[in-house]
Amino acid sequence: MRFKSIQQNIEDEGKVNVREVNPDSYAERDHGYTAGIFSDAEENFGITQQVADSTQNPTSKPKSRHAHFHETVHENPSEYSRSKCKQPTNEKEYDKAIEALVAKAIVEEHSGQQFPVYKGLEQYTLLQKMGDGAFSNVYKAIHNRTGEKVAIKVVQRAQPNTDPRDPRKRQGVESHNILKEVQIMRRVKHPNIIQLLEFIQTPEYYYLVLELADGGELFHQIVRLTYFSEDLSRHVITQVAHAIRYLHEDCGVVHRDIKPENLLFDSIDFVPSRVRKYRAGDDPDKVDEGEFIPGVGAGTIGRIRLADFGLSKVVWDSHTQTPCGTMGYTAPEIVRDERYSKGVDMWALGCVLYTILCGFPPFYDESISLLTKKVSRGEYSFLSPWWDDISKSAKDLISHLLTVDPESRYDIHQFLAHPWISGSREPTFPATDAPNTAQRENPFTYDFLEPEDVAAAGSAARTPGVNSLREVFNISYAAHRMEQEKIRKRGQRGNQGIMNFMGDMDDLMEENDDYDDGTKSVEHSMKRVNLSGENDPSLASRQPAQSQQQSSQRSRNKFKGFQLNLSKATLYNRRHRQKV
């Protein structure tokens, strides 16, 4: 009965609208009562399913899935609930929806863009592919009746394995993993978190219908703008922090995968800068970030939205308000486990802040093993000249987030109270293990390739270097999650009772499987992409001969401390060529 508290919590908060689509008729099933026809494991997550009446007319017009979802979810309204669907109330709104569909159909007809036909999504028209993963695709779509634009995550269900060499291997995502993500997403309602609108399943796929953030990924804006100003960085990271605070303190959830790819944004109108400001080492052709408007944003970046809860887990139960235990009887080991779990998100917050301020991640190496070692040891630096013009207060804040010891790392309340965030003029101090911000890096030469102007984030995201950078983020965060898991398990040794209890929680969250499978997948992806660029003819052709010789020479040299070969990372190519 280890699932009892979470099960009760879900029942108290209301049911998730889960729709099972009949593969024969694909008619809408909506009978008005729920029955648990999932397996026992699925029921333990508090997920219910709509069951069809055998006498239902398969030709009857289906109701709006969105309308039924909100009837169910808003039995207990939340102050953060703001995800009501746009329901046309007059002929004019219906005309607009139809016009949008026709316009898009014309565009697609001329572009020749085609999408798979997914049974169960007949009420939606797919407009654009926004991203993909090993077993999933994300599409921008429009609801055929209401005209509401949404994002739909299409996840392939695990199918029976036909490979006799590995009978345990299954292609696709297991039901308990996707249902865990759904269970967590339906609990959270916050303006800085993408909302789950509907969950649909067929024999082949799971469909997560999500709110659409029209700006796309923050990652693409880092590529486009190279880096963000301190004002825009503060605007972005503060919103992410508020989402984390809500998850940690109000929901008892840790995200465990906070990175630029999973930070989406609502776009705003661009206002050109009245006076352009440049930092040392900037390319004169750097894209204008635009005028920062307090409370609104800059560079088309408005409201930030946290997405993708595939690696999330619950660390405490809302009934006891304590970390996974009974009030007043919680062992120190479990309290520390909650601290370690939340610390993973705070570390990631520091990585994101570092990256958006300077344009590259704090941990980088072409070797996966060396990269993971640097992450586990916290070996980073504020590289000159790119950090020379960034305030000491910002560096101090980052140092408190990237400290190796989770007991010393800032929690979300300390982060939000820091002078750089709050805007106070109080003096700030670095963490005890922070790098020396006054020391200049070892005097070796950075050679940059001549950059090609990136006209749009979409084209930039398809370059080999950008794909490599994505994998650097993935490896860095996976390595840190595993390191924190080792620390947590070491702290549990010697107390078998606690080990058994936490073992149950591990089973509930499948966190060990997440770590192992996720890391193997990322390492495989890393091996497929070309981190170095040495074998990429398109990069080699743009690199001057002298640069190639110097790059080869640097690979034979040994430097102490943090090593970063900037000539081989495409994101850096947008920076001005300069000798340090």
Swiss-Prot record:
Region (Disordered): 51-91, 530-580
Residues binding ATP, per UniProt: 130-138, 153
UniProt cofactor(s): Mg(2+)
Domain Protein kinase: 124-421
Catalytic activity: L-seryl-[protein] + ATP = O-phospho-L-seryl-[protein] + ADP + H(+); L-threonyl-[protein] + ATP = O-phospho-L-threonyl-[protein] + ADP + H(+)
SMART domains: S_TKc
Sequence similarity: Belongs to the protein kinase superfamily. CAMK Ser/Thr protein kinase family. CaMK subfamily.
Name of protein: Serine/threonine-protein kinase srk1
Upper classification of the organism: Eukaryota, Fungi, Dikarya, Ascomycota, Taphrinomycotina
